[in-house]
UniProtKB/Swiss-Prot annotation:
Molecular functions per Gene Ontology: structural constituent of ribosome; tRNA binding
Gene name tied to this protein: rps10
Protein name, per record: Small ribosomal subunit protein uS10
Native organism: Methanocorpusculum labreanum (strain ATCC 43576 / DSM 4855 / Z)
Organism phylogeny: Archaea, Methanobacteriati, Methanobacteriota, Stenosarchaea group, Methanomicrobia
Function (record text): Involved in the binding of tRNA to the ribosomes.
InterPro entries, sorted: Ribosomal_uS10, Ribosomal_uS10_CS, Ribosomal_uS10_dom, Ribosomal_uS10_dom_sf, Ribosomal_uS10_euk/arc
One GO CC annotation: small ribosomal subunit
Family per record: Belongs to the universal ribosomal protein uS10 family.
GO aspect biological process, one term: translation
Amino acid sequence: MQKARIRLTGTDYEKVETVCTRIREIAERTGVNMAGPIPLPTKRLIVPIRKSPDGEGTATWDRWQMRVHKRLIDLDADERALRQLMRIQVPKDISIEIVLEN
């Protein structure tokens, strides 16, 4: 049987977790085997910016960061489960990638 590998990425971990719980509910309702959600390492994108625009005075810095959270879910590729997966309301700042594997 084919497996569907679902990769979720987003900057807000709470939204990523809500999408994971929706996928888990679909797997329980349809009765397919599910592995995950497996938390992958969080990427931290850090941008240091100089506070003073003119370069005079002491060098003080602001550090801005954005964290990218990732989750990996494997489940059996049942037709009913995949149809319900396509109808999930996914927030705009979360990307979802589904790959079918043998």
